[in-house]
Amino acid sequence: MTSSKLTLEPNAREELLDHVREGASRDPPAEVCGILAGTGNTLSRILPVSNVADEPRVAYELDPQETLTKIESVEESGDSVLGFYHSHPESAPVPSATDREQASWPGYVYLICSPDGRMNAYEWTADVFEPLEISR
């Protein structure tokens, strides 16, 4: 990411919140996750990916094969992978200790969302999550 700001196109924001709310409505609630795609610092679409974590209520793990397939489709479309998203269905949209331990894509956006519509974006620097401004 070359900017300290992430712009969300309205359709991408709505798709994202729909996915987050769908996960939160499960019994028990589950974190959802996926890929952020667009150009520059503008998020134009999301690509949901199955959460294969052992405890999806409190953790996420992107399905590796599905992630690879979707990354290839983003690249073939001419868009770029901007980063990844996941939800916190029962807590604030801030990086947890687990999020910090598992972050592995320096320079990419990590977007964390809550079902109530709150969301925060960060760039992982390989050491810390640097907050990004979100604009609509």
Where are these regions (language model features)?
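Short, well-ordered beta-to-alpha junction loops that form the rim of enzyme active sites
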Residues: 87
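Conserved beta-strand-loop surface patch within small alpha/beta domains used
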Residues: 1-81, 90-136
